[in-house]
Swiss-Prot record:
This is Porphobilinogen deaminase. One of its GO terms (cellular component) is nucleus. Gene3D superfamilies: Periplasmic binding protein-like II, Porphobilinogen deaminase, C-terminal domain. Its cofactor is dipyrromethane. It catalyses: 4 porphobilinogen + H2O = hydroxymethylbilane + 4 NH4(+). PANTHER family: PORPHOBILINOGEN DEAMINASE. Pfam families: Porphobil_deam, Porphobil_deamC. The lineage of its organism: Eukaryota, Fungi, Dikarya, Ascomycota, Saccharomycotina. GO terms for biological process: heme biosynthetic process; protoporphyrinogen IX biosynthetic process. The modification S-(dipyrrolylmethanemethyl)cysteine is found at residue 251. Keywords: Heme biosynthesis, Porphyrin biosynthesis, Transferase. It comes from Saccharomyces cerevisiae (strain ATCC 204508 / S288c).
Length: 327
């Protein structure tokens, strides 16, 4: 008998393929007897390139088509696991699916990218009315608080497409905002003009980490994933996802986070913000908690902070955003 094959699913974009192959290598390094193959698929989020993400909620934009293949009738098309950018993965998965593991986190920050020919080095340099390209309402809402004189316009497409739009001499954008991790994974770290930290902008829940989705209760896959996943990223991201789930936010709403786990003290510091779309109202808070049971305590940390923020008005902000989306 030959080696057992594992089918790994992911999106078709260049970044998604790099991420799927990264997980393939992690598995094959620990389990050389497995023959891993990557299967790619276009998702609804890939197909709808002309509308801002904010306008249609986006809770399963990047996942559903791939999930169908975890239970596919045809063995040649059936997947064993799916690799997602964790920030695109809904915090509540459909019945029959679960988050099997989280890989080591790459830089979770957002970053500013200027065109090759630009003399500007930061948002502070931009003139009044300068146009910032971003499809993320989380990014634009937070930046509007600090830079009310700038304009924010949607820019869709994969990383290469967005960079081409930015570098075009006729581009309407003075700059664009991207996730630092995506550029780093693609070998484009040289395009990062400036990284943002929480004094300017909190990053997305799960940003910089990969989430691996499996069939619920698949003990064989769980055993494999236990060997390739990262404790620090798991603690931070489980707390961030619990916060988002308690706030009932999808990946297209203005919830920003920053988390840090200290492996010596076993304490997790979680900071979060909820902002209205125009950047005029915000609820910001933080919590530090001792993590003794990885799953239970990490999730409790996020839930407690979210409940405090709801009491301070965060839910009201998010409910108004959802009402605007329905109109």
């Amino acid at each position: 008998m030959g080696p057992e094959t594992l089918h790994i699913g992911g999106r078709k974009s260049k970044l998604a393929v790099i991420q799927s192959n990264h997980v393939l290598k992690l598995i094959e390094e620990k389990y050389p007897d497995y023959d891993c193959k990557v299967f790619t698929l276009q998702t609804l989020g890939d197909q709808i390139q002309f509308k801002p993400l904010y306008s249609f909620g986006g809770k399963a934009l990047w996942t559903k088509e791939l999930e169908d293949h975890l239970y596919h009738d045809d063995p040649s098309k059936k997947l064993d696991l799916i690799v997602h950018s964790l920030k695109d993965m809904p915090t509540l998965l459909p019945e029959g699916f679960e988050l099997g593991g989280i890989t080591k986190r790459v830089d979770p920050t957002d970053c500013l990218v200027m065109p090759f020919y630009s003399a500007y080095k930061s948002l502070d340099d931009l003139p009044d009315g300068g146009i910032v390209g971003t499809s993320s309402v989380r990014r634009s809402a937070q930046l509007k608080r600090k830079y009310p004189h700038l304009k924010f316009e949607s820019v869709r497409g994969n990383i290469q497409t967005r960079l081409q739009k930015l570098d075009d001499p006729k581009s309407p954008y003075q700059c664009i905002i991207l996730a630092s991790a995506g550029l780093m994974r693609m070998g484009l770290e040289n395009r990062i003009t400036q990284r943002f930290h929480s004094d300017t902008m909190y990053h997305a829940v799960g940003q910089g980490a990969l989430g691996i989705e499996i069939r619920k209760g698949d003990t064989k896959m769980m055993k494999i994933l236990d060997e390739i996943c990262d404790l620090n990223a798991t603690i931070c991201c489980l707390s961030e996802r619990a916060l988002m789930r308690t706030l009932e936010g999808g990946c297209s709403v203005p919830i920003g986070v920053e988390s840090k786990y200290n492996e010596e003290t076993k304490k997790l510091l979680l900071k979060a913000i909820v902002v209205d779309v125009e950047g005029t109202e915000a609820v910001e808070d933080e919590i530090e908690m001792l993590i003794e049971n990885v799953k239970e305590d990490s999730m409790a940390c996020g839930k407690i902070l979210a409940e405090r923020m709801i009491a301070d008005g965060a839910k009201k902000i998010l409910d108004e955003i959802n009402l605007d989306r329905i109109k």
